Design a protein with these regions (language model features):
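Predominantly five- to eight-bladed beta-propeller fold
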Residues: 2-38, 45-110
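A short beta-strand motif characteristic of beta-propeller blades
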Residues: 24-26, 101-103, 118-122, 166-167
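Blade-terminus and WD-like Trp-Asp/Gly-His loop motifs, strongest in beta-propeller folds
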Residues: 31, 36-45, 126, 131-141
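Short loop/turn positions that demarcate and connect the beta-strands within blades
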Residues: 31, 105-107, 113-117, 125-128
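Short glycine/acidic-enriched loop and turn motifs that connect beta-strands
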Residues: 53-56, 147-151
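Short consensus segments that form the blades of beta-propeller domains
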Residues: 77-84, 144-148, 156
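Repetitive beta-architecture junctions, highlighting loop-to-beta-strand starts
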Residues: 88, 98, 153-155, 163
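Structural recognition of the beta-propeller blade-terminating site
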Residues: 94, 156-159
Length: 167
Protein backbone atom coordinates (compact mmCIF):
# COMPACT_ATOMS: atom_id res chain seq x y z
CA UNK A 1 0.00 0.00 0.00
CA UNK A 2 1.21 3.49 -0.83
CA UNK A 3 -0.70 5.07 2.05
CA UNK A 4 -2.14 3.87 5.33
CA UNK A 5 -3.35 7.06 6.99
CA UNK A 6 -6.51 7.83 5.02
CA UNK A 7 -9.65 8.35 7.09
CA UNK A 8 -13.27 9.10 6.27
CA UNK A 9 -13.63 12.62 4.87
CA UNK A 10 -9.83 12.88 4.46
CA UNK A 11 -9.18 10.00 2.10
CA UNK A 12 -6.80 9.73 -0.82
CA UNK A 13 -8.28 10.59 -4.20
CA UNK A 14 -11.80 9.30 -3.69
CA UNK A 15 -15.10 11.02 -4.18
CA UNK A 16 -16.32 10.40 -0.65
CA UNK A 17 -19.54 8.62 -1.65
CA UNK A 18 -21.16 11.50 -3.49
CA UNK A 19 -24.39 10.54 -5.26
CA UNK A 20 -25.00 7.63 -2.90
CA UNK A 21 -27.93 7.60 -0.54
CA UNK A 22 -27.33 6.45 3.03
CA UNK A 23 -28.46 2.87 2.31
CA UNK A 24 -26.06 2.57 -0.65
CA UNK A 25 -23.26 4.14 1.41
CA UNK A 26 -23.58 1.46 4.11
CA UNK A 27 -23.87 -1.31 1.50
CA UNK A 28 -20.76 -0.12 -0.41
CA UNK A 29 -18.68 0.75 2.67
CA UNK A 30 -16.12 -2.03 2.20
CA UNK A 31 -15.97 -1.92 -1.59
CA UNK A 32 -12.85 -0.55 -3.23
CA UNK A 33 -13.21 2.97 -4.59
CA UNK A 34 -11.42 4.39 -7.58
CA UNK A 35 -8.74 7.00 -7.01
CA UNK A 36 -8.95 10.18 -9.07
CA UNK A 37 -5.32 10.52 -10.16
CA UNK A 38 -3.38 11.83 -13.15
CA UNK A 39 -0.20 10.09 -14.30
CA UNK A 40 2.95 11.61 -15.75
CA UNK A 41 3.58 10.47 -19.35
CA UNK A 42 6.47 8.23 -18.20
CA UNK A 43 4.34 6.67 -15.40
CA UNK A 44 6.97 7.43 -12.77
CA UNK A 45 4.73 9.83 -10.85
CA UNK A 46 1.08 10.54 -10.33
CA UNK A 47 -0.71 13.56 -8.91
CA UNK A 48 -3.87 13.70 -6.88
CA UNK A 49 -5.90 15.97 -4.67
CA UNK A 50 -6.55 14.99 -1.08
CA UNK A 51 -9.46 16.93 0.39
CA UNK A 52 -9.90 17.36 4.15
CA UNK A 53 -13.62 17.67 4.82
CA UNK A 54 -13.61 16.49 8.44
CA UNK A 55 -14.64 19.89 9.83
CA UNK A 56 -17.24 20.65 7.15
CA UNK A 57 -20.83 20.22 8.31
CA UNK A 58 -23.16 17.66 6.78
CA UNK A 59 -26.03 18.47 4.45
CA UNK A 60 -29.08 16.21 4.34
CA UNK A 61 -31.16 15.78 1.20
CA UNK A 62 -34.38 13.75 1.15
CA UNK A 63 -35.40 12.10 -2.11
CA UNK A 64 -39.15 12.06 -1.53
CA UNK A 65 -40.00 10.33 -4.84
CA UNK A 66 -37.72 7.32 -4.36
CA UNK A 67 -39.49 4.00 -4.71
CA UNK A 68 -40.73 2.34 -2.55
CA UNK A 69 -39.85 4.80 0.27
CA UNK A 70 -38.04 8.15 0.49
CA UNK A 71 -34.26 7.96 0.92
CA UNK A 72 -31.78 10.20 2.69
CA UNK A 73 -28.51 11.36 1.17
CA UNK A 74 -25.93 12.89 3.52
CA UNK A 75 -22.72 14.57 2.42
CA UNK A 76 -20.31 17.28 3.50
CA UNK A 77 -21.13 20.72 2.11
CA UNK A 78 -20.04 24.23 3.06
CA UNK A 79 -23.04 26.54 3.14
CA UNK A 80 -22.61 30.29 2.49
CA UNK A 81 -21.33 32.06 5.58
CA UNK A 82 -19.94 28.94 7.28
CA UNK A 83 -16.30 29.12 8.32
CA UNK A 84 -15.56 25.39 8.05
CA UNK A 85 -14.32 24.84 4.50
CA UNK A 86 -12.80 21.84 2.71
CA UNK A 87 -9.01 22.08 2.49
CA UNK A 88 -7.43 20.73 -0.70
CA UNK A 89 -3.90 19.31 -0.76
CA UNK A 90 -1.92 18.60 -3.97
CA UNK A 91 0.16 15.42 -3.64
CA UNK A 92 2.77 13.91 -5.94
CA UNK A 93 3.56 10.21 -5.62
CA UNK A 94 6.89 8.76 -6.76
CA UNK A 95 6.42 5.17 -7.92
CA UNK A 96 10.14 4.27 -7.82
CA UNK A 97 10.58 4.81 -4.08
CA UNK A 98 6.87 4.63 -3.13
CA UNK A 99 6.84 8.03 -1.44
CA UNK A 100 4.59 11.05 -1.68
CA UNK A 101 5.01 14.72 -0.97
CA UNK A 102 2.60 17.58 -0.60
CA UNK A 103 3.29 20.59 -2.78
CA UNK A 104 2.80 24.06 -1.32
CA UNK A 105 0.21 25.66 -3.61
CA UNK A 106 -1.81 27.75 -1.14
CA UNK A 107 -2.56 31.29 -2.31
CA UNK A 108 -6.17 32.05 -1.35
CA UNK A 109 -8.25 31.36 1.74
CA UNK A 110 -10.57 28.39 1.10
CA UNK A 111 -9.23 27.93 -2.45
CA UNK A 112 -10.17 25.19 -4.90
CA UNK A 113 -7.50 23.36 -6.89
CA UNK A 114 -8.07 21.82 -10.31
CA UNK A 115 -5.54 19.52 -11.97
CA UNK A 116 -5.30 19.78 -15.74
CA UNK A 117 -5.41 16.55 -17.68
CA UNK A 118 -3.67 16.09 -21.01
CA UNK A 119 -5.90 16.40 -24.08
CA UNK A 120 -7.26 13.10 -25.35
CA UNK A 121 -5.86 11.89 -28.64
CA UNK A 122 -8.32 11.61 -31.51
CA UNK A 123 -6.81 8.24 -32.39
CA UNK A 124 -7.83 6.92 -28.97
CA UNK A 125 -11.40 8.18 -28.88
CA UNK A 126 -12.87 4.72 -29.51
CA UNK A 127 -10.54 2.88 -27.13
CA UNK A 128 -12.14 1.10 -24.19
CA UNK A 129 -9.40 2.37 -21.89
CA UNK A 130 -7.69 5.75 -22.07
CA UNK A 131 -4.88 6.76 -19.72
CA UNK A 132 -5.42 9.66 -17.32
CA UNK A 133 -2.35 11.81 -17.91
CA UNK A 134 -1.52 15.21 -16.46
CA UNK A 135 -1.08 18.20 -18.74
CA UNK A 136 2.60 19.13 -18.94
CA UNK A 137 5.85 17.20 -19.05
CA UNK A 138 7.20 14.37 -16.90
CA UNK A 139 8.56 16.89 -14.38
CA UNK A 140 5.98 19.68 -14.63
CA UNK A 141 2.22 19.81 -14.39
CA UNK A 142 -0.43 22.48 -14.73
CA UNK A 143 -3.25 23.28 -12.34
CA UNK A 144 -5.63 26.08 -11.44
CA UNK A 145 -6.29 27.58 -8.05
CA UNK A 146 -9.54 29.48 -7.62
CA UNK A 147 -10.51 31.82 -4.81
CA UNK A 148 -13.69 30.93 -2.90
CA UNK A 149 -15.48 34.05 -4.24
CA UNK A 150 -14.45 33.12 -7.83
CA UNK A 151 -12.91 36.56 -8.37
CA UNK A 152 -9.42 35.22 -8.98
CA UNK A 153 -8.19 32.18 -10.88
CA UNK A 154 -4.49 31.44 -11.25
CA UNK A 155 -3.22 29.12 -13.96
CA UNK A 156 -0.07 27.61 -12.47
CA UNK A 157 2.78 25.32 -13.42
CA UNK A 158 4.59 23.34 -10.74
CA UNK A 159 7.99 21.65 -10.97
CA UNK A 160 7.42 18.36 -9.14
CA UNK A 161 11.11 17.94 -8.25
CA UNK A 162 11.71 21.34 -6.66
CA UNK A 163 8.10 22.10 -5.68
CA UNK A 164 8.36 25.54 -7.31
CA UNK A 165 4.99 27.00 -8.33
CA UNK A 166 4.82 29.62 -11.09
CA UNK A 167 1.48 31.40 -11.69
Amino acid sequence: ALTKDGVEYFAYGGGGGMNENNIEKVKNKNKRKSANILWSADSRHFAMLRVDQRNVKELWVINSIADPRPTLETYKYQMPGEKEAPVEHLLIFNMADKTNKELSVKQFKDQNIGLWSAPALKSGRDDDWRPSLWHGTNGKLYFTRTSRDLKRIDICMVDINSGTVKP
